[in-house]
């Protein structure tokens, strides 16, 4: 991570943007070259900086350009939105739960249980599905109650209006 400096933050026009990226962007070199042609400058060699710079320049639609395996958390200080983004086929996991107005997320379920008040309560429906399909399961369903995963090819948008799920790839 020393090259990626995560979480990575950038300021632009008085707004703060932050990103955490778990994974690899296969077309990073091409994306970076395009951004450089458009006048962007980079201080690292990381995928993380390329994704953040592309987002700041183009907005959330930039994720459609990403080819790779990844889970991303991205804070947009200008719009006051948090995005949770998962790769097209769901190689990299990304789990979340809500407690009141707080959205808790992690790349592993055990990371959610480290948050006070998030308990590992068994979800009977999810458990039955695993025993019935095992070891496969439906995306979005799990063994633990109120623990969800961002679907492959989707992103979540979280702001003062709540949580919205969007598909960016099918």
Name each model-derived stretch.
Residues 1-170:
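Cysteine-centered catalytic environments shared across enzyme families
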